């Protein structure tokens, strides 16, 4: 079982330029090297992407519902139209990400260790809740 998902992860990493629209739901991709991957319209529902390298990935209209992206490197990734409902972004690096909105983040889970792009301001309230504000770019 373990060997199967490691082999699958390596196959996906090797074809990272050809993942547009691919169904990767429930995929176990912990620590995957998917920097600059084209994941446009990919189904990543409930995928495990813990500590994955997704720098400069194209996540345009990707479905990341319930995806676990904790501690993933998503710097400079494109989130245009991406679905983040119930996704987990705890400790993720979103520095330099583009097209990420407060509306998307309202549906996601994250913590104080999550790093946001400069145009997104998260204000944590005393009761543990947060408010999101987008700066004009």
Residues of each region from the PLM?
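Tandem repeat scaffolds
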Residues: 1-137
